[in-house]
Amino acid sequence: MKEYKDLLKLVLDNGIMQENRTDTDAIAYFGTQSRYDLTKGFPLLTTKKMAYKAIFHELLWFLKGETNIKYLVDNNVKIWNEWPYENYKKSPYFKNESIDEFILKIKEDDSFAKQFGELGPVYGRQWRNFNGVDQITNLIEEIKKNKYSRRLIVSVWNPSEIKNMLLPPCHCLFQFFVNSKNELSCQLYQRSADLFLGVPFNIASYSLLTYMIAQVTNTTAKEFVHTIGVAHIYNNHIDQVKEQLTREPLQLPTLVLNKNIKNIFDFKIEDIEIKDYNSHPAIKGKVAV
């Protein structure tokens, strides 16, 4: 996607290297916006191979309101593993297990998973129970009843619960908009964005959410607008980013949803299909915790 490559180049060329809460310095640039036309294909990155099933499982996990990694682990999704593992290492129960041994315990021992697989009141909790409010249900009902509302907003930044989260939400507020052609667009505000590892997931995830909400509200998916506060490229991802910039984007794939689904909470992984996905080879990078 040209829009994503433009974002990488903007930050690489204009950002400033600085320290952050992790042990890895990053090139940071404040204030970006990218727009992805959802009528021209599903915006799944093609300049490196994406594990898109992991993206879909994570979104379904959010929609379930879950905050424990057990569901993700059971479905071989590894993107959240590091945070509960680092938290477990601080506990008196830690016996120098590797992260692989920790994840195996999560998978095989339900009581262990319940105690040590929890992330705190992160995305799923805030989506479905923000101080008692089910924001996703409210959002969809409001689109159905008052689609031109300018209050079609979900907030994940809950100051009263931030301290209890292993990782405060990076993508923290999103808003929907229906135009006079009955086309649905979504804008995400992301306070902090790991451009190499995180952002390709975020683009695909919120685009998928837009398509799903469009289906259950009888609208048509139009555009995903991605607004970022601190866009950053970690020091140990610079070579990977430069490699991506040498690669030409390929044709975008097509998203196919099960048209029989009328309630967003009824979607399962088998109801989401990607067709004609071709990409350049995968590029690995280490997550900063």
From Swiss-Prot:
Reactions catalysed: dUMP + (6R)-5,10-methylene-5,6,7,8-tetrahydrofolate = 7,8-dihydrofolate + dTMP
Pfam families per record: Thymidylat_synt
Active site: 170
Similarity-based family: Belongs to the thymidylate synthase family. Bacterial-type ThyA subfamily.
Annotated keywords: Cytoplasm, Methyltransferase, Nucleotide biosynthesis, Transferase
Organism whose genome encodes this protein: Malacoplasma penetrans (strain HF-2)
Protein name, per record: Thymidylate synthase
InterPro entries, sorted: Thymidate_synth/dCMP_Mease, Thymidate_synth/dCMP_Mease_dom, Thymidate_synth/dCMP_Mease_sf, Thymidylate_synthase, Thymidylate_synthase_AS
Subunit (UniProt): Homodimer.
GO molecular function: thymidylate synthase activity
Enzyme Commission code: 2.1.1.45
One cellular component (GO) term of this entry: cytosol
